[in-house]
Amino acid sequence: MTKHNGKYYFQYGAPGTEFKVYADGVYVSDSPLGPFTYQQHNPMSYKPGGFVQGVGHSGTFQDLKGNYWHVGTCMLSLKYKFERRIGLYPTAFDPDGVMYSTTAFGDYPCWNADYDIKNPSDRFTGWMLLSYEKPVKVSSTDSIYSSSNLTDENMRTYWAAKTGEPGEWIEIDLGAMKHIKAIQLNYYDHKSVQHNRANDLYYQYRIYSSDNGTDWTLAVDKSDNDKDVPHDYIELGETLDARYLKLENIHVPSGNFCLSEFRVFGFADGEKPLPVRNFKVARDKQDKRNAMISWNPSSDAYGYNIYYGIAPEKLYNCITVNGADHYDFRGLDLGTTYYFAIEALNESGRSALSKVVKQ
């Protein structure tokens, strides 16, 4: 329950903990004991697309600057159906008292609570994904756990080396010189036998950069790390210009050297994508809760953000789609009119938002 401007916002986790559409809804009342009314904008926290999916079982709090945040559990469900990760998303109340959580670019680098930013959508740094579907070389591969899984933007697939020994490595080719601002290493467990806590529950590694794939320079040194950070995010102090990155294993707690994703963020030289053309939304005549969303693919885009909401100026929810030109959407309410828009994403930035479509 969150109290804001005299109203009480009762939040709850909807069914579907084990699915990517797991979300939180909200009811609103003038009294803490009700009666409560279903908020027309629902779910209030929703993330069915992108690298990290799902945001339910959540809680809302304020930071020291008064900004609201929604911390929720995100679907993984790979080793076990209720396997989760934790996501943190900026949250706000609009002038009409509508509570919403911004999950657009929620799995990209964003400005944290140290930055006094009132509009949740302004927390995105603008650093684009540089690693999507880029070619990867590895020191070894265990069974079916292919190196292509390292750059597919899917947290539920992973690559594993044959061992967890020092010297196992990953090399990624970004295709051209890129301006790198941050790196995220998403470790995973493969053939791990560790139970409970241990003194060596941490990852140690080095990252090297290169212009030509032959001559390497040390870029990140975590050889003495002693913190348990399985989704390690490294924000570089200065922009790193490089084409190749190489990750060298030094220590894993148990099992094989294994990652679900090697993510790189920053900028590429070039133009931002053009606005998306032929954006269409068709609600199912038999079941208005469903809609088929389609568009013409942009030749220079790797992904798209679909925004929707209950008014043209309230497009608060976002669905990220990579490498596709359609989305089968099954998350609408009966009896509610919705508005949709889309933007294209490439390594140089974001396109202008499309015209808003009413359905």
Regions found by a protein language model. Give the residues of each.
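Hydrophobic core segments of beta-strands in well-ordered, beta-rich domains
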Residues: M1-G16, N67-L76
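Structural motif
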Residues: F19-Y27, K79-L88
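Short S/T/G- and acidic-enriched coil/turn segments that sit immediately N-terminal to beta-strands
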Residues: G25, Y203, P230-Y233, G323-D328
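Blade-edge beta-strand/turn elements of extracellular beta-propeller
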Residues: Y27-G50, D96-A104, L218-D221
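Aromatic, loop-rich ligand-recognition surfaces of beta-strand-rich domains
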Residues: D152-V220, P230-R277, Q286, N296, ...
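Extracellular low-complexity, O-glycosylation-prone stalks/linkers
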Residues: Y208-S209, S298-I319, G323
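Conserved aromatic anchor
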Residues: R289-A301
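Beta-strand-rich modules
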Residues: F329-R350
